[in-house]
């Protein structure tokens, strides 16, 4: 299999974890910000997580530099465009990018400007390359909840025209879903699809709650259903897709090694698994890398790869017309 040439779909990719290191330097210059270094190798080292981190919080430290420069409309549009450009250049045909709008208000940028900027960057890339995309609004579980409705209302202007879904992300504690029931309900009332980060850090119960309490149609990571039979059966029975991110899961110690990742066992048992990057820069990866790692580690056939590709298409938060286009690559 030529992994680069294969059509690919990435349903779980974070904007601020996928910024080009050179872009950090360029934007810091434009914004008169002082970086710890102007050496691209030093900047890259600060942005890329080690192959294994002691925990998820250590991994999340790599987002500090992007957060510094992602405070203007121009920066957000550029970073959005470049992410879709990078993905298109390795034959990613459809990309869903998630980002936390509330993280980009340090300098007073309005929610409307933030939404407009990322969607504009994406649409510019769609016009130039053979790629389709959408944005997912991520709310960090640790942030104050009083602004969640405002985020959802601002995003609604682009609903199904660049923005499609609501997500909860960040550090995962047991039982977090109970606090967010009214917000997920409001998102659904407005027309958002729902995907929730859950079961990334040991609590299979969180996956059960994400589906049963929040109405998650997909789950980010979800790998700890392997030690929670009720969550496992719910995911399988409801055909909830898991957005697995193999390299990231090894880095954050969700699994000890790729060979121990449950993706193959899940797939063989009929669970809807998808292959994704999580963070292209922080995990120092591409979709080509992720597909290669999974196919080689678990000896998947080309037919099995295209089956997983088709699962990704069927679970994408996009129109039937785009899905038909994406399925044409699997013929």
Curated annotation (Swiss-Prot):
The enzyme's E.C. designation: 3.5.4.4
Binding positions (Zn(2+)): 12, 14, 197, 278
Record keyword Cell membrane present: no
GO CC terms of this entry: cytosol
Cofactor requirements of the protein: Zn(2+)
Pfam families, alphabetized: A_deaminase (PF00962)
Example of a GO MF term: adenosine deaminase activity
Cofactor note: Binds 1 zinc ion per subunit.
Binding site for substrate: 14, 16, 170
Catalytic activity: adenosine + H2O + H(+) = inosine + NH4(+); 2'-deoxyadenosine + H2O + H(+) = 2'-deoxyinosine + NH4(+)
Site residues (Important for catalytic activity), renumbered to this chain: 221
Keywords of the record: Hydrolase, Metal-binding, Nucleotide metabolism, Zinc
Active site: 200
Family annotation (SUPFAM superfamilies): Metallo-dependent hydrolases
Biological process according to GO: adenosine catabolic process; hypoxanthine salvage; inosine biosynthetic process; nucleotide metabolic process; purine ribonucleoside monophosphate biosynthetic process
Recorded superkingdom: Bacteria
Family: Belongs to the metallo-dependent hydrolases superfamily. Adenosine and AMP deaminases family. Adenosine deaminase subfamily.
Job of this protein: Catalyzes the hydrolytic deamination of adenosine and 2-deoxyadenosine.
Official protein name in the record: Adenosine deaminase
Originating organism: Vibrio vulnificus (strain CMCP6)
């Amino acid at each position: 299999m030529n992994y680069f040439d294969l059509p690919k779909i990435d349903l779980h990719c974070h904007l601020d974890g996928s910024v080009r290191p050179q872009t950090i330097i360029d934007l810091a210059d434009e914004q008169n910000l002082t970086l710890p270094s102007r050496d691209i190798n030093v900047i890259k080292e600060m942005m890329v997580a080690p192959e294994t981190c002691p925990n998820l919080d250590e991994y999340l430290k790599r987002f500090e530099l992007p957060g510094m420069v992602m405070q203007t409309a121009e920066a957000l549009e550029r970073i959005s465009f470049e992410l879709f450009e990078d993905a298109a250049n390795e034959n990613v045909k459809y990309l869903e990018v998630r980002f936390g709008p509330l993280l980009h208000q340090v300098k007073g940028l309005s929610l409307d400007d933030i939404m407009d900027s990322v969607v504009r960057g994406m649409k510019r890339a769609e016009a130039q390359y053979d790629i389709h995309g959408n944005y997912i609004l991520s709310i960090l579980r640790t942030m104050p909840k009083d602004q969640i409705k405002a985020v959802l209302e601002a995003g609604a202007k682009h609903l199904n025209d660049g923005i499609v879904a609501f997500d909860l992300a960040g550090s995962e504690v047991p039982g977090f879903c109970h606090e967010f029931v009214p917000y997920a309900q409001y998102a659904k009332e407005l027309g958002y699809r729902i995907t929730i980060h859950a079961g990334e850090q040991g609590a299979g119960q969180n996956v059960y709650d994400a589906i049963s309490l929040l109405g998650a149609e997909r789950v980010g990571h979800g790998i700890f259903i392997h030690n929670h039979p009720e969550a496992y059966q719910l995911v399988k029975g409801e055909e909830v897709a898991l957005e697995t991110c193999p390299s990231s899961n090894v880095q954050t110690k969700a699994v000890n090694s790729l060979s121990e990742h449950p993706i193959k066992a899940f797939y063989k048992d009929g669970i809807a698994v998808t292959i994704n990057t999580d963070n292209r820069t922080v995990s120092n990866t591409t979709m080509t890398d992720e597909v290669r790692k999974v196919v080689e580690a678990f000896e998947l056939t080309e037919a099995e790869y295209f089956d997983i590709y088709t699962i990704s298409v069927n679970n994408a938060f996009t129109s039937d017309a785009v899905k038909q286009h994406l399925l044409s690559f699997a013929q």
